[in-house]
Regions:
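Conserved beta-strand -> loop -> alpha-helix junction used to position metal-binding or nucleic-acid-contacting
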Residues: 27-43, 50-52
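Hydrophobic side chains within alpha-helical segments
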Residues: 20, 36, 96-98
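Phosphate- and divalent-cation-binding pockets in alpha/beta enzyme and binding domains
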Residues: 16-23, 180
Length: 272
């Protein structure tokens, strides 16, 4: 039935379902996606999640997945949810999806965006699901070398910062840095926020760096720390052990401009 081109399969964010079922050798032929229908109709007006669409257009608040599996470290996987609760959740999911489809399908024609949906948005589903399953090849050894290089440069900067400060402290602590800059060294321009700690944001350090070496070196240290923690270290954690690749998720119904977004991890903001 799923692979019968005469049978239309309707989903909400159906790219996710395509990826899951592909692991079991199942494929959809004819598809519609209520999330992308909403995006074609109302892009930039509101979010296009099932909860948002259900509440806005059906006046119904769906059962939250968090209420079933929990959150954080105490969260369970869906296979541990009692079968009656899981069944009700799945049935509601399917019911909301088909009701949204019946609402959006004629609106596409009335709003004259059927062509946008059928020729731009919907065809992307299969392309992006294939891309996500294939993944992005990443050289772990290169990331490790870069992380080690960043660590060495940070350590060297820390020694220079300690020398200028006259003592060791946690360079990554805004509170300790503020005390060094404004209390111990007496730099001008110190301003405390609501927490009582000095502000040591990028703009503050940039102003101080025009006169002093220590703030300039802290700026360099922060840049290296950001590169290491956010990119070279974090990307290693996202490498799938089975494929050796990073499998991001491409978001179609995200940016108001129509451009793709990337999440978990975001591969579109990695510096060259």
């Amino acid at each position: 039935v799923l692979s019968d081109p005469a049978v239309l399969i309707v989903g909400q964010n159906i790219k996710y379902d395509i990826k899951i079922l592909s692991k079991y050798g199942l494929a959809f032929e004819a598809i519609d996606d209520t999330m992308l229908m909403s995006y074609a109709l109302h892009g930039g007006i509101h979010r296009h999640s099932m909860d948002t669409l259900s509440e806005k257009y059906l006046g119904h608040t769906p059962v939250s997945i968090k209420s079933l599996i929990g959150t954080g470290k105490s969260a369970i996987t869906f296979d541990f949810v009692p079968i009656d609760e899981a069944s009700n959740y799945a049935a509601e999911d399917a019911d909301i999806t088909i009701r949204l489809w019946k609402l959006f399908k004629p609106k596409l024609h009335l709003s004259k965006v059927t062509k946008v949906y059928e020729t731009l948005e919907r065809p992307l589903v299969r392309v992006l699901s294939d891309m996500e399953l294939l993944g992005i090849k990443v050289d772990r050894d290169t990331l490790v070398r870069m992380s080690n290089s960043f660590s060495q440069k940070m350590a060297h900067l820390e020694e220079e910062i300690y020398s200028l400060a006259g003592e060791k402290f946690n360079v990554g602590s805004p509170k300790q840095l503020g005390e060094i800059l404004f209390d111990k060294l007496g730099y001008a321009g110190g301003a405390k926020g609501k927490t009582g700690a000095y502000s040591t944001g990028a703009d503050v350090l940039a102003d101080l760096a025009t006169e002093y070496d220590l703030p300039s070196k802290v700026i360099d240290w922060r840049q290296l720390s950001k590169l290491k923690s956010t990119y070279t270290d974090a990307l290693q954690d996202h490498i799938n052990p089975a494929s050796g690749r990073v499998h991001t998720s491409y978001v179609i119904a995200g940016a108001n401009t129509g451009r793709l977004a990337s999440a978990d991890p975001n591969l579109q903001n990695i510096p060259c």
